[in-house]
């Protein structure tokens, strides 16, 4: 149907494995032309699924060079939409502008609560009774794009941060896969920084 690529920035590979497994089984009817990451150790995962892998290191001094490499890859492979499988970086504005409501992110909290890089730690400090995951379209405002899918799981005082992270990772996989499927099936209508998702 369309072309998607998976951006992977940190060594959190649970969402990547899940997407590739669903792709391989035919659940996600989409082509994945390549995977790009700043970690070479994810290359064997891409190889095992027969998907081209590109290692693009990210640093403050080489941020512009990395951005240009990403744009070249996106254009070369005629990418239709982008999936950020725990990207954990701020997406460049020119890429967001080139793919309006076509960049799908997974955030490891129930937005709008606990934005940023360590929401499980923040949730633990607040003593929350539920944790969640949110998949949304990327906009120039951090973790504030139109929400496609969310889900939650109950937790208690007995859970450690490690427990919260483990429970959250299971949610992240399901929420991201559901959001991708809704996007592929053209079930998402965006308006006023919100979405209507048709069932």
Residue ranges of model-derived segments:
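Donor/substrate-binding cores of folate-linked one-carbon enzymes
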Residues: 38-39, 62-66, 77-199
């Amino acid at each position: 149907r369309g072309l998607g690529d998976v951006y992977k920035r940190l060594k959190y590979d649970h969402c990547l494995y899940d997407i590739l497994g669903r792709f391989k089984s035919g659940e996600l009817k989409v082509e994945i032309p390549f995977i790009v990451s700043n970690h070479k150790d994810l290359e064997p995962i891409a190889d095992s699924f027969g998907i081209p892998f590109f290692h693009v290191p990210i640093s403050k001094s080489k941020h512009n060079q990395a951005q240009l490499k990403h744009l070249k890859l996106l254009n070369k492979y005629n990418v239709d939409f982008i999936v950020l499988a725990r990207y954990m970086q701020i997406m460049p504005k020119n890429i967001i502008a080139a793919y309006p409501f076509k960049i799908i992110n997974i955030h490891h909290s129930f937005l709008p609560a606990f934005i940023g890089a360590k929401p499980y730690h923040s949730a633990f400090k607040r003593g929350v009774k539920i944790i969640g995951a949110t998949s949304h379209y990327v906009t120039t405002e951090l973790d504030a794009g139109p929400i496609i899918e969310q889900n939650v799981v109950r937790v208690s005082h007995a859970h450690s941060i490690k427990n919260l992270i483990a429970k959250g990772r299971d949610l992240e996989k399901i929420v991201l896969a559901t959001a991708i499927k809704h996007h592929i099936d053209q079930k998402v209508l965006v308006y006023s920084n919100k979405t209507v998702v048709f069932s």
